[in-house]
Each structure stands twice: as C-alpha cells, then as structure tokens.
Amino acid sequence: MTGKTWLIIPAYNVDKYIDTLLFQTVCYIPPERTIVVDDGSSDLSGEIARKHGVQVIVHSNNKGKGRSLRDGLELVMQNGGDWAITIDGDCQHDPAKIPAFLSAGESDKYDIIIGNRHRSGTKMPWDRKLSNMLSSAVISVVTGQKIDDVQCGYRMIRISELKDFEFKAVSYDFETELLLKMVRKGARIGQVDIPTRYNGEASSIRRMRDTIRFIKLVSLYLIRRI
C-alpha cells in the first residue's frame, strides 16, 4: 500500500508555472502533503506556492536541485510519510500521471518508480536524448536492472528505503546518487511511461560538469563506496 504519499516540488524561478502546477497536483495529493522547495528564487515562486496552502521550504540562495530534493525528503521522513513523488516545478511533467505512479506503488513490487519519457511520443531535444540514452545504458549495466530514462526527475520513492543514507550530491547528480544507493540496498525499480512538455527554455544541466560527476558516482558505486 502507498499509505501517506507526499509530493516534493523543487522550484527555482518558476513563477510562470507553479500556480498552474499546484492547481493540478491538488487533485491527487492534498496541500498539507505537498512541499515546494523555493531554491533561492529571485521571482515570486515561493509567494505563489504559499497561496495554495502547501508547505514551503525557502533557501536563502540557490543551493541546487539535489539539495532541494534532500530537504524535501527529510521533511517527509520527519512527518512519517511512506512515499514521496518528486515532480519538476516548471510544468514539464504532467500531474495527470500521478495516479499511474500511485498504482505502481500500490502493487508493492517496487521501491522506486521512475518516469520514462521515451515511449510517450514526446520529441526530446537531441542532445538531452543522447546524454540520457548513454547514462541510462551505463546505469542499467552496472545495477543489473533495466532503466530507460535515468535522468527523469518524475519519480516515486519508498521512504523506508532511505533510512540511514548519507548523501553528498547537491545538484542533478543527487538523483543518480539516490538511485545507486537504493539499488545497493536491494531496491526494486519500476517505470511509468510519461509525456514531457518542453517549454522552450534552456536546460539548467551543465553537460560537461554533470558528466564528470556522473562518472565519479558510477566509479564509486563500482568500487562499493556507494
């Protein structure tokens, strides 16, 4: 059973999107179990989120998506949550797929469920697609579990699997670190097909820097340091 499921939304300068997103997510996860992490935004992201009655964590400066997710997960653990769904704050992920994640969690077959954008017919920018395919292939090989879209931030995580974990990553590599730590512990991975709506804005992922961080994480996993 999915029990108490929470929603975590990392938000950085998304005041154009956060209002619409929260109007949609409330259909599936109540405001009191929704956490928006305002990661040092210079716009009105946090103020708009508060109007929806959700819990808002504010960073005084931009600390990175990984730190936002870590802080959100810690709050879910403190409140005795069973699961956490993570969804980006820029409306690229469709909240209407939340029931599909909940259903996968209800099956009790998985400990982490990851969105898969590749079978939805969505046209992903070629550079993101290439990077994603390569990193997904590497993670699938080293973990022994097939993962089609390892870079997807739309996920559902069983909170009990995170007990005693210590994380170091604070940027986008946090999602890879979390996945590798969970697999090391024996986590079962599920996938849900999702569409993605690209809004035309440049990705905040820095390819070279994040590729180096990815290689480092995989290397640490292989020598059993993760």
Predicted features and spans:
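Cell-envelope/extracellular polymer assembly enzymes that use nucleotide-activated donors
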Residues: 4-6, 177
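Donor nucleotide-sugar binding loop of glycosyltransferases
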Residues: 14-17, 41, 94
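Acidic helix N-cap motif at the loop->helix transition within catalytic regions
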Residues: 17-20, 43-51
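Short beta-strand-to-loop acidic/aromatic patch adjacent to the donor-nucleotide binding site
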Residues: 81-90
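Catalytic donor-sugar/metal-binding loop of nucleotide-sugar-dependent glycosyltransferases
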Residues: 146, 168-170, 180-197
